[in-house]
């Protein structure tokens, strides 16, 4: 039946790039992810330079092998900055740091992660990982996608967190 699913995936019943269809996915910029060697010095730099304050974290995420904190400017509706540091020696984020890449992903919230993944696949994106629950988002599901233009995006589902087993 694998062939059946493949044929269904290739069929696109509607063009998801039409404005009304995109609106139904509820895409909103959530944050910009920045790879850093250590959280504290980076957070302090953003505080001194631009007035950013830590609003959540740090969180250790054993699945992604990183530790993260979210920062925001007081009274500002702008997107947050997520600082991401390696938690282990084999953390994938270390590859970004080795290449001197800091800001490396934009994260968009979506009301329907499953429908959003169908949409991005139709646009030629590859799902790198997920959907899976994320510690930094109280168990809400995330997915990572790689665009044909060589950009990495994170999608995070809005709404209720996934209940973790006790």
Model regions: which residues?
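Short Gly/Pro-enriched loop/turn and capping motifs at secondary-structure junctions
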Residues: 88-89, 113, 134
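Broad gene-expression machinery/nucleic-acid interaction feature
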Residues: 31, 105, 142
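Core segments of cupin and vicinal oxygen chelate
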Residues: 23-29, 34-78, 116-118, 122-126, ...
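Mid-chain, well-packed structural core segment of small domains
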Residues: 95-123
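Extracellular structured ligand-interaction cores
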Residues: 29, 103, 152
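Conserved short beta-strand elements that form part of the metal-binding/catalytic scaffold
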Residues: 9, 53-97, 138-160
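Short beta-strand/turn micro-motifs composed of small residues
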Residues: 36, 85, 110
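Vicinal oxygen chelate
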Residues: 2-25, 69-72, 108, 117-166
């Amino acid at each position: 039946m694998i062939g059946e699913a493949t044929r269904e995936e290739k069929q696109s019943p509607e063009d998801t790039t039409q404005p009304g269809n995109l609106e139904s996915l509820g895409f909103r910029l959530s944050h910009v992810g920045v790879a850093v060697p250590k959280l504290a010095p980076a957070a302090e730099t953003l505080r001194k330079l631009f007035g950013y304050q830590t609003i959540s974290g740090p969180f250790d995420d054993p699945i992604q092998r990183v530790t993260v904190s979210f920062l925001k400017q007081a009274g500002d509706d702008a997107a947050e900055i997520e600082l991401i540091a390696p938690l282990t020696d084999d953390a994938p984020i270390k590859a970004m740091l080795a290449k001197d890449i800091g800001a490396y992903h934009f994260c968009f919230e979506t009301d329907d992660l499953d429908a959003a993944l169908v949409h991005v696949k139709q646009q030629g994106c590859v799902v790198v990982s997920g959907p899976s629950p994320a510690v930094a988002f109280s168990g809400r599901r995330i997915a990572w996608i790689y665009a044909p233009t060589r950009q990495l995006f994170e999608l995070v589902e809005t709404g209720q967190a996934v209940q973790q087993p006790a």
